Amino acid sequence: MFSQSLTIEQVDPDLWQAIKGEVQRQEDHIELIASENYASPAVLQAQGTVLTNKYAEGYPGKRYYGGCRYVDIVEQLAIDRLRNLFNAEYVNVQPHSGSQANAAVYLSALKPGDTLLGMSLAHGGHLTHGSAVNMSGKIFNSISYGLNPETEEIDYAELERLAHEHKPRMIVAGASSYARVIDWKAFRQIADNVGAYLFVDMAHYAGLIAAGYYPNPVGIADFVTSTTHKTLRGPRGGVIMAKPEHEKALNSAVFPQTQGGPLMHVIAAKAVAFKEASSQAFKDYQKQVIENARVMARVLQQRGLRIVSGRTDCHMFLVDLRAKNLTGREAESALEAAHITVNKNAIPNDPQKPFVTSGIRIGTPAITTRGFKEPESEELANLVADVLDAPANTAVLDQVARKAQALCTKFPVYGN
């Protein structure tokens, strides 16, 4: 029998020290990585329950194991809440990640060698949208579309030309570093014109979509996937939504083709996050996320930095560092020394290598969860600019670190 009084600190002090260090890092550093956020205490609690003990291969009411009465309730809650949140018909909450959700979509609808038309990774797409280093680019014939070099927005004319030239079986919309509104209906029309499936990966925009501040692709696309963290502010995981005629193929593609038992403790946390996302407080939060991103982009422009495509319509944007003669890797390192966390990111047609880059990506979901509003976002953008103006100046980095820590103290993530 286990003693419920035993703690991680008592059982595994080495691991506990690492966890404590990460807790402190999250509290003491300002998080600007666009794909990161802070899960609520309720989401964290759900992931730490005895649901982790339960195997439940299959789906509610159709399990391969006994004893699934309560996990069926848990999964059905997640299913119903996700369906209501995005006005979806079919949903699957079992994918362990966004990448696995995407893989399930491909396997459900495509055959090896079929043509896939997705956004170029170099222009803001994702590895799983046909990159040569990902299975999506190895199993399928991957063709990439990109951005208009003048506007740095999706080149819909090029997309249509490529679609007619290559006749893809599937067109993929969605991005990992694209700051503007994506026209799902334009994608739908192009897909229909060439007889292709339309698949939308809305992982980055899901929270904004749930709140009504970004167009909803559900009902427009044949398939929609998302992660459940990022702007949705849930646990790390994935989901699939689709038109009902794809239910059988998708269920099979998730289990048994790509996964075995679902992670019931994570599905419980997804259910909590979906409930939180249906609240007015969450809608207000998403509105503030966008306002904070726009404020930061404007201030950085005023400080002499170029924002890719000129502005942002969502939670993130790319900063071109070439005018500062600075690489993304150098900027990431300098900002981390000043207690501000970003990620290096390629800009469109970046001359630098992927692990060096000419830009950084900035996102505001995490700082908005802390409680930052426009004044704090303006102050923070100026701190970022101070570091980018003098990345090798230790005195500047120390001064910015002190100011960043003061903001963190004023706006804690979890408090005590």
UniProtKB/Swiss-Prot annotation:
Pfam families: SHMT. Its cofactor is pyridoxal 5'-phosphate. GO terms for molecular function: glycine hydroxymethyltransferase activity; pyridoxal phosphate binding. Pathway: One-carbon metabolism; tetrahydrofolate interconversion; Amino-acid biosynthesis; glycine biosynthesis; glycine from L-serine: step 1/1. The record marks 229 as: Plays an important role in substrate specificity. GO terms for cellular component: cytosol. GO terms for biological process: glycine biosynthetic process from serine; tetrahydrofolate interconversion. InterPro entries: PyrdxlP-dep_Trfase, PyrdxlP-dep_Trfase_major, PyrdxlP-dep_Trfase_small, Ser_HO-MeTrfase, Ser_HO-MeTrfase-like, Ser_HO-MeTrfase_PLP_BS, SHMT-like_dom. Its EC number is 2.1.2.1. It is found in: Cytoplasm. The keyword Secreted does not apply. Signal peptide: none annotated. It catalyses: (6R)-5,10-methylene-5,6,7,8-tetrahydrofolate + glycine + H2O = (6S)-5,6,7,8-tetrahydrofolate + L-serine. Keywords: Amino-acid biosynthesis, Cytoplasm, One-carbon metabolism, Pyridoxal phosphate, Transferase. (6S)-5,6,7,8-tetrahydrofolate binds at residues 121, 125-127. Belongs to the SHMT family. Catalyzes the reversible interconversion of serine and glycine with tetrahydrofolate (THF) serving as the one-carbon carrier. This reaction serves as the major source of one-carbon groups required for the biosynthesis of purines, thymidylate, methionine, and other important biomolecules. Also exhibits THF-independent aldolase activity toward beta-hydroxyamino acids, producing glycine and aldehydes, via a retro-aldol mechanism. Homodimer. This is Serine hydroxymethyltransferase. It comes from Nitrosomonas europaea (strain ATCC 19718 / CIP 103999 / KCTC 2705 / NBRC 14298). The gene is glyA.
